[in-house]
């Protein structure tokens, strides 16, 4: 009994449309949608920035390190043979 029925919501919607007009309501809806989209984009940009900068040091290339380690091994193999 204390809740708002569907008919009451429809009457309120008609009154709002009559007061503001459809163009103004469409503009308000578009502004609200772009604000929500901007907020979501800012949140995702912040999360991706946190994921990119995870460590305090510069990453090293494994290829250079493997090449340095491979060179002494070949010399050892030649000496043993």
Swiss-Prot record:
* Matches recorded under InterPro entries: TatA/B/E, TatA/E
**What are the recorded GO MF terms, alphabetically?**
protein transmembrane transporter activity
The transmembrane residues are 1-21
Q: Which UniProt keywords apply?
A: Cell inner membrane, Cell membrane, Membrane, Protein transport, Translocation, Transmembrane, Transmembrane helix, Transport
- Keyword Transcription regulation in record: no
Q: What the protein does?
A: Part of the twin-arginine translocation (Tat) system that transports large folded proteins containing a characteristic twin-arginine motif in their signal peptide across membranes. TatA could form the protein-conducting channel of the Tat system.
Subcellular location as annotated: Cell inner membrane
Q: Which NCBIfam families match?
A: PRK02958.1, PRK03625.1, PRK04598.1, tatAE
Region Disordered: what ranges? 42-81
A Gene Ontology term for the protein's cellular component = TAT protein transport complex
Query: Where is this protein chiefly located?
Result: membrane
| Annotated membrane topology | Single-pass membrane protein
**Database matches in Gene3D superfamilies:** 1.20.5.3310
Q: What is this protein called?
A: Sec-independent protein translocase protein TatA
Q: Which GO terms describe its biological process?
A: protein transport by the Tat complex
What is annotated about its quaternary structure and interactions? Answer: The Tat system comprises two distinct complexes: a TatABC complex, containing multiple copies of TatA, TatB and TatC subunits, and a separate TatA complex, containing only TatA subunits. Substrates initially bind to the TatABC complex, which probably triggers association of the separate TatA complex to form the active translocon.
What family is this protein classified in? Belongs to the TatA/E family.
């Amino acid at each position: 009994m204390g809740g708002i029925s569907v008919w009451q919501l429809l009457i309120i919607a008609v009154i709002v449309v009559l007061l503001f007009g459809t163009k103004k309501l469409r503009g308000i809806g578009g502004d609200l949608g772009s604000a929500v989209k901007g907020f979501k984009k800012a949140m995702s940009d912040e999360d991706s920035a946190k994921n990119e900068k995870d460590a305090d040091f510069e990453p090293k290339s494994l290829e250079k390190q493997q090449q340095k380690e491979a060179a002494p091994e070949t010399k050892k193999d030649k000496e043993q043979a």
